[in-house]
């Protein structure tokens, strides 16, 4: 092991979500900073001397001035598409506006969706070790950390965020790689579908900044119906939503039609499994002796599980796919928006964590092999 004092520093935990990045120090209760995982670039010409400085905006500043900016998410479906932008966002995490610390002084725990391309992990390691010079790095699966946050060692985590939905069965602390299910239908797809439905209802949102308005409408107005056919037949009460310019928008059936996409991806012509099937199939791919326990220990995680009525709808759908006499129990922790980060904070504060990470020295000797050896 190299100079122990730096390695003994408090690790930095970064939950690198497709939609929101959460960052803070291990041992904290909640992440210190959460901001949308996008960069904004001005799309107009500066004509005044006192104009807003800078060619790239990240974090609260990008949110504040988003009307002037073209907004781009460097991550799509849990995979980084633009490494330059991703690097700028990570730089910002360490900057004086955020963690106010030097990257070379703290080990890092970074999260990743399961079944991601291994190239994604290799490139992330390369950026952290070679650009940020971190002393040590560990890349962990999001769902496992969510289970840590609930204090359990057995359960199946259904994690649905902005880019990826996945179900990971874990038994007595062992994850079962062959049972993991993942689909790339998540919150951002719901937002896109909502934008389409709102266009049909007469509201047009076309710029990247207006897409963020659609996301906010989704978070405030959408809900999951327990019986969508019945709700289609009834007259849905419209909810009035005030847009940033002061005008109002009446949101009708789009309120429950948009999140319906999570359970019926074929609404947009996608052939993926619905969320309930992802969960049930993950359990069915596990050993027969474990299934009963897993059905009674379902844990929800991620922002897309926060829709009103989500738990009830999931329960009614999973009941149809489970054996008759099996008891199904779904727990939805209140802090599930952050549970991956909280789990990371717990894991990175444990003494055993020091045995898990890849040190800079190991990385220099073995390269990306060291990363694959220590992540699963």
From Swiss-Prot:
Record has Cytoplasm as a keyword: yes
Gene3D superfamilies listed in its UniProt record: 3.30.420.40, Actin, Chain A, domain 4
N-acetylmethionine modification, residue list: 1
Subcellular location as annotated: Cytoplasm, Cytoskeleton; Cytoplasm, Cytoskeleton, Microtubule organizing center, Centrosome
Source species: Mus musculus
Stated name of the protein: Beta-centractin
Main location: cytoplasm
GO terms for MF: ATP binding
UniProt keyword NAD present: no
Family statement: Belongs to the actin family. ARP1 subfamily.
Function (record text): Component of a multi-subunit complex involved in microtubule based vesicle motility. It is associated with the centrosome.
SUPFAM superfamilies per record: Actin-like ATPase domain
Pfam families assigned to the protein according to its UniProt record, in alphabetical order: Actin
InterPro entries, per database record: Actin (IPR004000), Actin/actin-like_CS (IPR020902), Actin_CS (IPR004001), ATPase_NBD (IPR043129)
Keyword list, A-Z: Acetylation, ATP-binding, Cytoplasm, Cytoskeleton, Nitration, Nucleotide-binding
Modified residues (3'-nitrotyrosine): 4
GO cellular component, one term: cytoplasm
């Amino acid at each position: 092991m190299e100079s122990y004092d730096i390695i003994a520093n408090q690790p930095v935990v970064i939950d690198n979500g497709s939609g929101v990045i959460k960052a803070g120090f291990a041992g904290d209760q909640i992440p210190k900073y959460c901001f949308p995982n996008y960069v904004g670039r001005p799309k107009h010409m500066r004509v005044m001397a006192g104009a807003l400085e800078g060619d790239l905006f990240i974090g609260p500043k990008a949110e504040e001035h988003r009307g002037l900016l073209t907004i781009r998410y460097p991550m799509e479906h849990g995979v980084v598409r633009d490494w330059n932008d991703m690097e700028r966002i990570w730089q910002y995490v360490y900057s004086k506006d955020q963690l106010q610390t030097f990257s070379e002084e703290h080990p890092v725990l970074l999260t990743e969706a399961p079944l991601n391309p291994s190239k994604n992990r290799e490139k992330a390691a390369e950026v952290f070790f070679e650009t940020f010079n971190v002393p040590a790095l560990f890349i962990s699966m999001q769902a496992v950390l969510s289970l840590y946050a609930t204090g359990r060692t057995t359960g199946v985590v259904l994690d649905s965020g902005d880019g990826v939905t996945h179900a990971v069965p874990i038994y007595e602390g062992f994850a079962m790689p062959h049972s993991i299910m993942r689909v790339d239908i998540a919150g951002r797809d719901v937002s896109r579908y909502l934008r389409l439905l709102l266009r049909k209802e007469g509201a047009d949102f076309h710029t990247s900044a207006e897409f963020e308005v659609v996301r906010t409408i989704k978070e405030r107005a959408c809900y999951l119906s327990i019986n969508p056919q019945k709700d289609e037949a009834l007259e849905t009460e419209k909810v009035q939503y005030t847009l940033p310019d002061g005008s109002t928008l009446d949101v009708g059936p789009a309120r429950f039609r948009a999140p319906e996409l999570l359970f019926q991806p074929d609404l947009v012509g996608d052939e993926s499994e619905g969320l309930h099937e992802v969960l049930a199939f993950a359990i069915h791919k596990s050993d027969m002796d474990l299934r009963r326990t897993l059905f009674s220990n379902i844990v929800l995680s991620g922002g897309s599980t926060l829709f009103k009525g989500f738990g009830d709808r999931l329960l009614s759908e999973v009941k149809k796919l489970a054996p008759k006499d099996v008891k199904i129990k779904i727990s939805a922790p209140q802090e599930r928006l952050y549970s991956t980060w909280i789990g990371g904070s717990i894991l990175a504060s444990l003494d055993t964590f020091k045995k898990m990470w890849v040190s800079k020295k190991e990385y220099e000797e073995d390269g990306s092999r060291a990363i694959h050896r220590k992540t699963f």
